[in-house]
């Protein structure tokens, strides 16, 4: 309901009342009489200038003087200035002098006007105060509720999320199962003398499903779930954060067994005393209150505190000690099997073509986390709806991957034939170098379709399997592949363009990482140069401490330059080797706009030995690759149990 018209009418009546009060007061007090001081009255009496005096019972005194035949002057004397005895003496003297003395009844209206003139302003002030207090204490105001916790409470019957809705983090689920069992049956732990951790910290990159895991624990245990972000505690007023912490924990204890989940706890749990000012602030007071509340738990409380962060290195040590967040669970990005399971979960309830190859999609998305995969499926659903299709097909899902990686296709960006030709040779330079080098990532496809805000085309290379270690030879081959585009421009056109700017930046950074962090320089040896260290609130670019001399810095620069130049020369030699096949490949790419790594390998004569993407599961045919064949965590667990039996 809109309150503005009601407030406007109230304001109108207030203004009208003030106006009438002023008008009435002016009406009854408007006269041209002069208020004279007591001395002037005495002078008029002694000089016998008074010809008439009127005394009102409301205390007013009005007298008329006649200083000449032309005019008379009526004046008022305040009775408070006259004592009763002396005033009566003056009246007697005036009567003796023949002055007309009259006693009259006072003006009652003027009395009420004066009274209202005093009461109405007070009434207006009281009314405005009452109206303001009522508005501030309404449901839409937090003026008097800012000390209450803003945590969202999810009850046990509010569309519970369970472990069946989580995939790709089997180890984390196994660790969290203890928390579920504790919430369901705390006595089972106390019988063995075990103490359930008071706090569980979920650590992992953004989007890996930390919040989803916490909700799944609450759903599995069927207990209330209190969700709050670390930034929700701290407000403008001092002490609000600590008050909200107390209120949150009191609510959780009243609803026990329950779970408190603090997302992004690094917003409030950073190292104390690490701010630029160095002093105590509201954030530290809030953190202290969290520590105190967690110390107040006992085994019978039935409340588990969970938190999530992607910056565990900046958390205060007191927060991580035993008795507080003493259990840390790492939530890693999913592997290829986990990605396939996550894709199936996000495809639930959506009209997906049964022939969709989720294993290929999972292998095309290395490094994707759960949030990325959810976005991928959603993008595919949007594309299917845009094309007026009733089901989501493999084509939409593959295009969605390209949209997530490189942005949407810019079909309206029309390049002239010369620029399109340069882009084609540039991308083929990347691809051919990748095909020829055995340790580079296998080439999956090449396209000259512009995507995103800056990309005019791209070459997609995929690892054949999930990798956790990278060798020096692999890094050098990938470095040469990155510089293959610039090498192709130099050889084919005899000049370079701005298209290789990002390639040079990536190549330089990779070479510097090899020298400074990985000890892969023959000249400088197995030494890590520089140390990442800094205060909590300093920017990332200021956190790398330089612990070497100017001479070493010069040698580092020379070594980085040497690695990049050598990789560039390798790329040039490989492009020159396949120069006779490059023109044919460019014509084919410009015509088709997108070609696979296998097609390019056949054109340049590397069909057998070329390093293009070969599906590791190519021999797995039929329904085993389809979306319906991907197992969820529950199905996988059942399968493991069957194997054990």
Swiss-Prot record:
Basic and acidic residues biased stretches: 634-645
Q: Tell me where it mainly resides.
A: membrane
Membrane topology annotation: Multi-pass membrane protein
Question: Mind listing the GO molecular function terms for this protein?
Answer: ATP binding; ATP hydrolysis activity; ATP-dependent peptidase activity; metalloendopeptidase activity; zinc ion binding
Can the keyword ATP-binding be found in this entry's annotation? yes
Q: Where is this region: Disordered?
A: 623-645
**What transmembrane ranges does the database entry give?**
7-27, 111-131
Question: Which residues does ATP bind?
Answer: 204-211
Name the family.
Answer: In the central section; belongs to the AAA ATPase family.
Quote the protein name from its UniProt record: ATP-dependent zinc metalloprotease FtsH
| Underlying gene | ftsH
């Amino acid at each position: 309901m809109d309150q503005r018209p009601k407030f406007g009418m109230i304001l109108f009546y207030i203004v009208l009342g003030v106006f009438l009060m002023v008008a009435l007061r002016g009406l009854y007090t408007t006269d041209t009489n002069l208020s004279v001081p007591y001395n002037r009255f005495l002078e008029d009496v002694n000089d016998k200038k008074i010809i008439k005096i009127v005394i009102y019972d409301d205390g007013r005194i009005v007298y008329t003087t006649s200083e000449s035949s032309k005019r008379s002057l009526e004046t008022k004397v305040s009775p408070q200035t006259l004592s009763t005895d002396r005033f009566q003496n003056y009246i007697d003297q005036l009567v003796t002098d023949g002055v007309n003395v009259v006693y009259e009844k006072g003006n009652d209206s003027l009395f009420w006007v004066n009274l209202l003139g005093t009461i109405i302003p007070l009434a207006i002030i009281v009314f405005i105060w009452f109206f303001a207090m009522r508005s501030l204490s309404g449901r839409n105001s937090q003026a008097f509720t800012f000390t209450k916790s803003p945590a969202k409470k999810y009850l046990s019957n509010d569309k519970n999320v369970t472990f069946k809705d989580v995939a790709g983090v089997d180890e984390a689920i196994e660790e969290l199962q203890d928390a579920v069992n504790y919430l369901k049956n705390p006595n089972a732990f106390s019988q063995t003398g075990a103490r359930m951790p008071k706090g569980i910290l979920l650590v992992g990159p953004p989007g890996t499903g930390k919040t989803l895991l916490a909700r799944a624990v609450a759903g599995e245990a069927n207990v209330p779930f209190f969700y709050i972000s670390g930034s929700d505690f701290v407000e403008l007023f001092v002490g609000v954060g600590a008050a909200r912490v107390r209120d949150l924990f009191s609510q959780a204890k009243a609803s026990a067994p329950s779970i408190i989940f603090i997302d992004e706890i690094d917003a409030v749990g950073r190292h104390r005393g690490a701010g630029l000012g160095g002093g105590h602030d509201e954030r530290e007071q809030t953190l202290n209150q969290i520590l105190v509340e967690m110390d107040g738990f006992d085994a019978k409380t039935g409340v588990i505190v969970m938190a999530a962060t992607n910056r565990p290195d900046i958390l205060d040590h007191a927060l991580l000690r035993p008795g507080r967040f003493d259990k840390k669970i790492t939530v890693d990005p999913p592997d290829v099997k986990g990605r396939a399971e996550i894709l199936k979960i996000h495809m639930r309830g959506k009209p997906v073509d049964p022939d969709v190859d989720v294993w290929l999609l999972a292998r095309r998305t290395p490094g994707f986390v759960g949030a990325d995969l959810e976005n991928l499926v959603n993008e595919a659903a949007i594309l299917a709806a845009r094309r007026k299709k009733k089901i989501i097909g493999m084509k939409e899902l593959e295009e969605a991957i390209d949209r997530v990686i490189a942005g949407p296709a810019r079909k309206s960006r029309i390049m002239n034939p010369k620029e399109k030709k340069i882009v084609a040779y540039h991308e083929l330079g990347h691809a051919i170098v990748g095909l020829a080098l055995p340790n580079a990532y296998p080439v999956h496809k090449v396209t000259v379709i512009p995507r995103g805000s800056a990309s005019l085309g791209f070459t997609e290379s995929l690892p054949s399997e999930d990798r956790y270690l990278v060798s020096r030879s692999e890094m050098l081959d990938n470095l040469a592949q990155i510089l293959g585009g610039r090498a192709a421009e130099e050889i084919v056109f005899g000049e370079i363009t701005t298209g290789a700017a990002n390639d040079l930046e990536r190549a330089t950074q990779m070479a510097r990482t090899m020298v400074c962090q990985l000890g892969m320089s023959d000249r400088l040896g197995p030494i890590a140069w520089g140390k990442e260290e800094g205060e909590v609130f300093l920017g990332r670019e200021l956190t790398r401490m330089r612990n070497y001399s100017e001479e070493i810095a010069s040698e580092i620069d020379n070594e980085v330059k040497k690695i990049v130049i050598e990789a560039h020369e390798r790329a040039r030699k490989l492009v020159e080797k396949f120069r006779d096949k490059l023109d044919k490949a460019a014509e084919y790419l410009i015509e088709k706009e997108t070609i696979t790594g296998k097609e390019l390998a056949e054109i340049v004569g590397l069909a057998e030995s070329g390093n293009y993407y070969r599906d590791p599961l190519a021999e797995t045919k039929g329904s085993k690759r389809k979306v319906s064949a991907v197992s969820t965590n529950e199905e996988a667990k059942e399968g493991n149990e069957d194997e054990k039996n």
